[in-house]
């Protein structure tokens, strides 16, 4: 995708707080490579400016690509602002970088520059949870409680050990309320204590909760677990690691709209 007289702008949406350390050096390197290929590049860090610049550039039909320089949260933020035909590339600067790993993006920005210029594209489904856009997955229950505590306590870069105290707090305080789940496959609500909804088969630490989720079938993959306790959490974890959990009577899996 060599730059034309119109579509020659690349917007890099950089999250300065993503991951354990700053990845600004990689952003600068990619910028220099693209400018050498006659692209115009804008590096933006303000949420409001990122949104406005993306929308205005699309209206002017000059936007060649958006680069998400951050973690999965950065990608989730810019996704709703991109038209379906606007390509998005990733510089993985976050803690887990699930979507980048799934699509094969790495910190090798020379390869990323080649992908941007060659124009290789892949269309993906997206989901909505409480009105919020997501590409990877959404969860309800203990997992979501931990993540909420992490983000409420966040003051800067997130490292893996940033989850330690929120995890311990959730272990102490979480009471596993009953969840009611409705899907297009059932007239009655399912009842569970844990619920995971996947668009792509990725989860933290590579846990294969739904290893066959399809990113382009127009549906989402549900995995729910009926029992809630710390002991049962370890049992479910063992089952997931062995790939046996979906055969258990208290675990429900389905693909639904």
Please annotate each region the language model reported.
Residues 72, 195:
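Short conserved active-site loop signatures built around small residues
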Residues 154-162, 203-232:
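Gly/Ser/Thr-rich active-site loops/lids in small-molecule metabolic enzymes
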Residues 16, 69-71, 91-93:
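Glycine-rich beta-strand-to-loop/alpha-helix junction loops that act as flexible
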Residues 11, 36-37, 44-45, 84-87, ...:
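Catalytic core of DAGKc-family lipid kinases
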Residues 1-66, 76, 187:
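ATP/NTP phosphate-donor binding region
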């Amino acid at each position: 995708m060599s730059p034309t007289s119109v579509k020659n702008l690349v917007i890099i949406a950089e999250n300065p707080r993503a991951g354990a350390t700053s990845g600004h050096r990689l952003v600068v390197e990619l910028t220099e490579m693209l400018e050498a290929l006659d692209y115009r590049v804008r590096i933006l860090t303000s949420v409001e400016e990122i949104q406005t610049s993306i929308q205005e550039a699309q209206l002017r039909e000059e936007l060649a690509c958006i680069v998400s320089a951050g973690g999965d949260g950065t990608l989730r933020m810019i996704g709703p602002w991109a038209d379906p035909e606007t390509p998005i590339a990733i510089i993985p600067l976050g803690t887990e970088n699930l979507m980048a790993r799934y699509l094969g993006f790495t910190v090798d920005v020379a390869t990323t520059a080649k992908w941007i210029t060659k124009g290789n594209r892949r269309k993906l489904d997206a989901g909505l949870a409480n009105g919020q856009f997501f590409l990877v997955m959404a969860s309800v229950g203990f997992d979501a409680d931990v993540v909420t505590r992490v983000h409420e306590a966040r003051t800067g870069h997130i490292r893996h050990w940033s989850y330690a105290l929120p995890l311990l707090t959730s272990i102490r305080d979480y009471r596993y309320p009953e969840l009611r789940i409705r899907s297009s496959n059932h007239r009655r609500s399912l009842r569970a204590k844990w619920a995971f909804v996947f668009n792509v088969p990725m989860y933290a630490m590579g846990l294969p909760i739904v290893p066959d989720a399809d990113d382009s079938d127009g549906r989402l993959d549900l995995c729910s677990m009926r029992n809630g306790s710390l002991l049962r959490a370890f049992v479910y974890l063992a089952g997931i690691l062995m790939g046996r959990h979906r055969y258990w009577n208290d675990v429900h899996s389905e693909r639904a709209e």
